[in-house]
Amino acid sequence: MTKYVFVTGGVVSSLGKGIAAASLAAILESRGLKVTLLKLDPYINVDPGTMSPFQHGEVFVTEDGAETDLDLGHYERFISTKMRKANNFTTGQIYESVIRKERRGDYLGKTVQVIPHITNEIQAFVERGAASATCGEPDVAIVEVGGTVGDIESLPFLEAARQMSLRLGRNSACFVHLTLVPFIATAGELKTKPTQHSVQKLREIGIYPNVLLCRADRRIPDDERAKISMFSNVPEDAVISVWDVDSIYKIPQMLHDQGLDELICEELKLTARPADLSIWSEMVEKLENPKSEVTIGMVGKYVELTESYKSLIEALRHASIHTSTKVNIEYIDSEELEENGVDSLKHLDAVLVPGGFGRRGTEGKIKAIRYAREAKVPYLGICLGMQLAVIEFARDVVGLKDANSTEFDQDTPNRVVALITEWYDREGKVEKRTEESDLGGTMRLGSQRCPIKPGTMAEEIYGKDVNERHRHRYEVNNRFVPQLEGGGLIISARTPSEDLPEMMELPRSMHPWFVGVQFHPEFTSTPRDGHPLFKAFVEAARAHHEASVEEKV
């Protein structure tokens, strides 16, 4: 039978519940247990797909095409279990499901209320999510409850967790509460009162935490832990200090050293072998002892909130681990390039243009792409970054000066990138869309396998085929491919059913390393293995850096 660990948060948001939950999962998995994770989001949006990256951060896409919270990316990076649509649900989905049932008459004329109907639905979603785990029936399902204790939006989720714990019985569920212990500089001391109040609030709604994870910018002294223990009625050995570190991949070892996994196993009566975190120690060792260093410029319009590119940043860190190369990322606002030109790019060892939507900042990205192509600087374009690379090539090499995407200019005569109106989904069914379609859930989403053209750089990186995740509406227009190929551009991978361009590159006779991909490879990168495309990109950046140093000498 699956046992549950509910992870809640208090005092403030953004303390790192997702990292804490993923780290605990990693330790339990290293003990031989089958683990899955779920994220409950209290917002009323059905999913984060149409939310602004400035508001929500990155949208993480699962293998089965769900647009989910970025914490699911952390989950996949920390454990081997793959996430699915059922691993993340929102208040919007819960209410949508309950209202649909009410309209069908499933409640037999009863008054539909938050308790029991909404809370029962939440419990059903949690159990269904755990049961659908890709690892088979999990020993442990770790359930992260979004928001903070005291938020009105989170109350139904917390009540559902309380009811579920009671229903499942002793040793079947436990609660881990992540809370803030701030350091007040003027007083020169850590303050435990916010944590005391947070636990008190949790207890008021009937939840008694088994473990406290106390976040601070420094290690919390034992006397402060004892104080927290006394006022929160949590045993002192279950008051765990979680301090700031320079790499999230150090956190599993930090939590294990303080016995978190043993506490959970004891509380849930789980029998498991000792934890083996050697792989995490090795990763941290490689991360901290690089043999070379490169600087990569990430050119985007959401650079003020780097959470918008979370998986991409982590994928570069993974490549750093596996190439023994320190990767410094410079975030470059594409709108500034439109105004000030590309001089700010000239010290970079490589340029990366990530995915995005909308016209704003696109001409700045195109300037960056032209610079990378002409200066022979390694370039990687992801999703929109590939589309803009094709547009730049069409304009500046092929000579189609007004080439554009219909996303930005409906009237352009040279629609090099356009909206595809019909395609096959993962089940082989025909999906259709138009400019007037709803934004939510109308993109090409999820994993798709496609063959790679022999003799290309793509084949060197991936092998015979590629299986990556998608999130986009617009595609490179096949009508212009002959002209693009006539200019030297290579379409190195295509979808098998619709024959749509999935990868492009320039031959080495034109550029040492210039690659664009329509999919999002960052979603499948893990610290354990890295990702072949990002490793190749970092190696190309390193080669460019070394060549530049030799030229200066």
UniProtKB/Swiss-Prot annotation:
Residues the entry annotates as binding CTP: 13, 151-153, 191-196, 227
Pfam name, any one: CTP_synth_N
Top-level class of the enzyme under EC nomenclature: ligase
Record Gene3D superfamilies: 3.40.50.880, P-loop containing nucleotide triphosphate hydrolases
Binding site for Mg(2+): 71, 144
Gene Ontology terms describing biological process: 'de novo' CTP biosynthetic process; pyrimidine nucleobase biosynthetic process
Catalytic activity: UTP + L-glutamine + ATP + H2O = CTP + L-glutamate + ADP + phosphate + 2 H(+); L-glutamine + H2O = L-glutamate + NH4(+); UTP + NH4(+) + ATP = CTP + ADP + phosphate + 2 H(+)
Residues binding L-glutamine, per UniProt: 356, 384-387, 407, 473
Catalytic activity, EC: 6.3.4.2
UniProt note on regulation of activity: Allosterically activated by GTP, when glutamine is the substrate; GTP has no effect on the reaction when ammonia is the substrate. The allosteric effector GTP functions by stabilizing the protein conformation that binds the tetrahedral intermediate(s) formed during glutamine hydrolysis. Inhibited by the product CTP, via allosteric rather than competitive inhibition.
Pathway(s) per entry: Pyrimidine metabolism; CTP biosynthesis via de novo pathway; CTP from UDP: step 2/2
Binding site for ATP: 14-19, 71
GO annotations of cellular component type: cytosol
SUPFAM superfamilies in UniProt: Class I glutamine amidotransferase-like (SSF52317), P-loop containing nucleoside triphosphate hydrolases (SSF52540)
Keywords: ATP-binding, Glutamine amidotransferase, Ligase, Magnesium, Metal-binding, Nucleotide-binding, Pyrimidine biosynthesis
Residue ranges occupied by any Glutamine amidotransferase type-1 domain in the UniProt entry: 295-547
Similarity-based family: Belongs to the CTP synthase family.
Function: Catalyzes the ATP-dependent amination of UTP to CTP with either L-glutamine or ammonia as the source of nitrogen. Regulates intracellular CTP levels through interactions with the four ribonucleotide triphosphates.
Other comments on record: CTPSs have evolved a hybrid strategy for distinguishing between UTP and CTP. The overlapping regions of the product feedback inhibitory and substrate sites recognize a common feature in both compounds, the triphosphate moiety. To differentiate isosteric substrate and product pyrimidine rings, an additional pocket far from the expected kinase/ligase catalytic site, specifically recognizes the cytosine and ribose portions of the product inhibitor.
Subunit structure comment from the entry: Homotetramer.
NCBIfam families xrefs: PRK05380.1, PyrG
Protein name: CTP synthase
